[in-house]
Amino acid sequence: QAQKLESAQFINSFSSQEISTLAGIPVAYGVDLYKVRYYTSDARGEEHIASGLACIPQDDTVRFPLACYQHGTVDGREDVPSRLAGGYQLPLILSAFGYVTCAADFVGLGDSPGIHPYVHATTQATAGIDLLFAVREMSEDDNYPPFYVTDQLFIGGYSQGGHASMAAHKYLETMYPGEFDIAAAAHMSGPYSISEVMIDFTLGDQPYNTVSYLAWVALGYMEAYPELLDTFTLEKVFKPEYLDDIKAFRDEAIGRGELNSRITNRLMTDYGAVLCREILLEDVLNSILSDPEYPLNQALMDNDVYDWAPQSLTNLYYCEGDDQVSFENAILAANVMTQNGAPNVQALRMDNTFPLNHVQCVSPAATSVVFFWGSMQQLLTSANDIELDDEVGIYYANDLLILDIPVSYSSSDLELKAYSLDGRLISSRPVAAGMSEHLMNLDSESMIVMSLFADGRLIKTQKFFTR
């Protein structure tokens, strides 16, 4: 593994109080933010320098799990996590719950030159993974303030980031087995089926308001597939009246939001509705809808990310009211993955009471992820006296804690400590090997961490939700 870290620069700090206010729920840690520059491959496979954000909890006595967070669609080059703009709040909040969270800007955004290959699975995956390697190197580098990471890894992302997190998840399990211990993956509202579900959703007879996505896909894939799409130009894909605006976006003269409103206004004027299909030349539209061998369709199919079998715990969060990414992406992905033999994949609906659109779905999905990840998270002390023992059992229900400690610990000095979510020691008591029950009285705590020590060494740590 060649070195990935080029440099890291401190940007800002947020206290736990500030983050709690931002999140609307109490968090455990303040967080330091760093802009990280690192080496990764561009769409042509050439190594270059990209940028991303590292969010580090402010406690160097704890070894934290890593989290790979992939951001959703942004407005353009500067609207990225490392600029504390698009997509930085969620990784910041996740970090405050005890994760060293990495959020790549992606290729063609932030410091990475060129056109961003939008929803290009390979570069989204490698940009996210190479940032993980860079931040792990940073934790071992004496030139930076000390922080410590475990091998445990959590993966997540929303919207474009759901597609990107799924791509990174697949890469990590298939190309980097053993590099990280993937505890859980949470893919939220992602377009996993680019070539089928998203094409039907965007190019059908119904209005589709984020029409700029289509232009960015075309620009990005022409960049990523120069051989496959060698005969394609913007002029051969889009109707002439849309070309100037798409080129202005390509040249970074306008952002995606401005491009979207310009195309939307023209479609409303010409057709009375935002029909995405109407920006495409007729022969291009017909070929996309009818010919699987059409080069653009081949490129789209190459970026479907659902036809595999994740072995780690995987949740796909969706809203049926989603107006930008059809919820059928999550249903299809969960079904195909399960048929492929994935042991633990489920699609979870977030808008059971009333429909939520793409923006409204963020909050319930992200809150669910905090609890989903939290149930799997292991926080370890940064000291080296850790020998976790899978034979030790700690179980909790209705204020009753049950310990199952192998008799091999009979001669050890055993101590059980309970910590609150914000790291306070709630109780400490001596315990004995074998089976034992303990009444805890934890009415005021929503979540606790139980840690068992043998002769001062941590041998088991387990997190429980108490209500």
Please provide the spans of the model-predicted regions:
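C-terminal tail/sorting-segment detector
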Residues: 387, 428, 443-467
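Catalytic-loop region of hydrolases
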Residues: 1-62
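Alpha/beta-hydrolase active-site loop
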Residues: 118-142
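Accessory cap/linker subdomain of secreted extracellular hydrolases
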Residues: 188-307
